[in-house]
Structures are given as structure tokens and as C-alpha cells.
Regions:
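Bulky hydrophobic segments
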Residues: 1-102, 108-109, 115-142
Length: 142
């Protein structure tokens, strides 16, 4: 038979790992659309904003999953850095994948924007958490 499944681990997988996997699939599917079927967007327009959002969200989801797990404390301790690294590595693999998609091509600038989106979202998360901690210590909320 095998090892008994710990229900806590099942909840962790559904709550933290499933969103990461689903978001990665969303990115993969959207980057699999041939360029001819995609509306033309300006270089620094919506297409780059989509990269910022996609990889920023991926980074946040990865940080959340790594930070919540308790089995490997070193991963939780470095969850911010690892979230950024994961998003950038996935961005590189996505650009490579686009080389085989008709009408699409991989761009290093997109990888840089992916990394910037990841850093921007994590910076926002850290600022939000710091503000929340500061206001939690001050009952007046000031």
C-alpha cells in the first residue's frame, strides 16, 4: 500500500500549490496563441502590462506557497527571493516555448519585464505587510 496521506498536506496542496499550477497553465495557454490570432499591441502598451501582471501574480502565488509550508524552513525563510527566481525561470521557459509557436518569438526584454513584475508585486506585498504590522501596533491607525 503506500504511506498514509496526511489531510493537512492535501489541504496545503489544494490551497497553495494548485493556484500556482493553474496560473502557470493560464500563462502557458496564453503564450501558445499564435501571434496572428492575437490583437496587435504596442511595444510598451498592454502586452508588457500583461507580462507584469502575469509574472507578478505568479511570484506572489509562489511566495505564498513557499512561505506557508513548514517542512523546509529554509524555503519559507527565503520565499520572497525564491518566488522571484521561480517567476523569472518560468518566464525564460515561456519565452523559449514561444519560439515554437507560429508567429511568436521569445524576447529577452519580456523576461526582464517578467522579473520586474515579480519584484514590483513582492515589493508591494512587503510594503503592505509592513504597513499592516505598523498599524496593528498603533490602535489609532495613524
Amino acid at each position: 500500500m503506500g504511506e498514509a496521506v496526511d489531510p493537512k498536506n492535501d489541504r496545503y496542496a489544494v490551497r497553495y500549490l494548485l493556484p500556482v499550477a493553474v496560473w502557470m497553465i493560464v500563462i502557458f495557454i496564453s503564450s501558445s496563441i499564435p501571434q496572428d490570432d492575437f490583437p496587435h499591441l504596442e511595444f510598451w502598451g498592454w502586452a508588457k502590462l500583461v507580462h507584469l501582471i502575469y509574472y507578478g501574480v505568479l511570484c506572489l502565488l509562489c511566495q505564498r506557497a513557499l512561505g506557508a509550508q513548514t517542512r523546509f524552513p529554509v524555503l519559507a525563510r527565503h520565499s520572497y527571493l525564491l518566488g522571484v527566481l521561480f517567476a523569472v525561470v518560468y518566464g525564460i521557459s515561456d519565452e523559449y516555448h514561444q519560439l515554437s509557436t507560429p508567429g511568436r518569438h521569445g524576447q529577452m526584454t519580456d523576461v526582464l519585464i517578467d522579473g520586474f513584475g515579480a519584484l514590483l508585486c513582492l515589493g508591494g506585498l512587503r510594503a503592505y505587510r509592513a504597513l499592516r504590522l505598523r498599524t496593528a501596533g498603533d490602535p489609532s491607525g495613524e
